[in-house]
């Protein structure tokens, strides 16, 4: 029970920090805040900024607690999703594709339904198109 409360509190803190980052207008400031969020909530930005989906899944497999693993994957997907708005092509599509795959995994394996997650997945499909097939 304490583990679940901790994870939920961590997610709330992360979402609040993400909202504060989104209020920043300047792209460089947003990028720096995103880097800070990676390092604070998910893991080293130096790794996740260049990791393939296979690398990410291997890293996440090291987290034994499934709820914690899915929460981190969801946070990472959010970071990829929002970071895509701060970069150009082809990096944008790569980030969106990775975000989609993580959202899809969390959606399939998690026990929490999220309409917001589904909406983001639909938006990514529109933006990226055939790359997801």
What are these regions (language model features)?
Residues 6, 26, 36-41, 80-81, ...:
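Aromatic-enriched hydrophobic runs in primary sequence
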Residues 68-92:
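Mid-chain, well-packed structural core segment of small domains
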Residues 1-73, 105, 127-133:
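N-terminal alpha-helical interaction modules that lie
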Residues 89-133:
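Amphipathic alpha-helical binding modules
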Residues 17, 77-80, 102-103:
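Non-transmembrane amphipathic alpha-helical segments
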């Amino acid at each position: 029970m304490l583990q679940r409360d901790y994870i939920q509190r961590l997610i709330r803190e992360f979402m609040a920090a993400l909202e504060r980052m989104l209020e920043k207008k300047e792209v460089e400031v947003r990028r720096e805040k995103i880097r800070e969020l990676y390092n604070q909530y998910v893991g080293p930005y130096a790794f996740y900024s260049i990791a393939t989906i296979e690398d990410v899944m291997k890293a996440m497999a090291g987290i034994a607690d499934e709820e914690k693993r899915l929460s981190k994957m969801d946070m990472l997907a959010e970071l990829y999703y929002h970071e895509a708005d701060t970069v150009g092509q082809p990096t944008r599509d790569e980030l969106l594709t990775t975000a989609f795959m993580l959202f899809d995994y969390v959606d399939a394996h998690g026990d929490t339904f999220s309409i917001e997650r589904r909406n983001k997945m639909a938006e990514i499909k529109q933006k990226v198109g055939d790359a997801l097939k």
